[in-house]
């Protein structure tokens, strides 16, 4: 994808500018995370406004995949979690370019666009207003492909928990209160940790989403318990993300 956008760029700086001019992305990495960024969202870019960042959502790192959904996360909007841009890199880029075609036309006025557009078409990317992301589409959560025998439980952070169905308690948990009792949630998650770690993780993430701004001992306890859940699910890379979060709090 970057090759199609930047094949004729003569420097890293020129490639960086090309991505910004075409997609409105400032290429970035893990430093874009906020305390409430879902661990499964791995930032690749920022927009330069209000902390908004874009990344790949990796629900289950143990599942081999050649591509992942792309989501946008706006940390200043506490009511909205990660929002789907595209189920793949190609779809996300096509949606972004189509949105710019509909609203501002900016990439298409550059002298490099005809050549870049031709390369993108060879990848199957053909921007069109009908493919644009309109304002009523901005709040789609990131729903993964669910393998046979697996289950996805949506969550308030827009990502949800994906795991083998046997890792969830047979009885779905009650909806989380807006002001949950953190101690009770920690106790419930602890009871599920070894037999039903996916349910435990869902409880902890829902509670954290509602309470993280307190930045108190409960916040750290929720994060520590999430680390245990990710290890129980054999997802050390996601446990490491939460460990880094703890270090930054």
Language model features: what each stretch is:
Residues 1-67, 72-76, 130, 136-249:
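A surface-exposed partner-binding patch
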Residues 63-116:
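Compact, glycine/acidic-enriched structural inserts
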Residues 103-141:
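Hydrophobic, aromatic-enriched interface-forming segments
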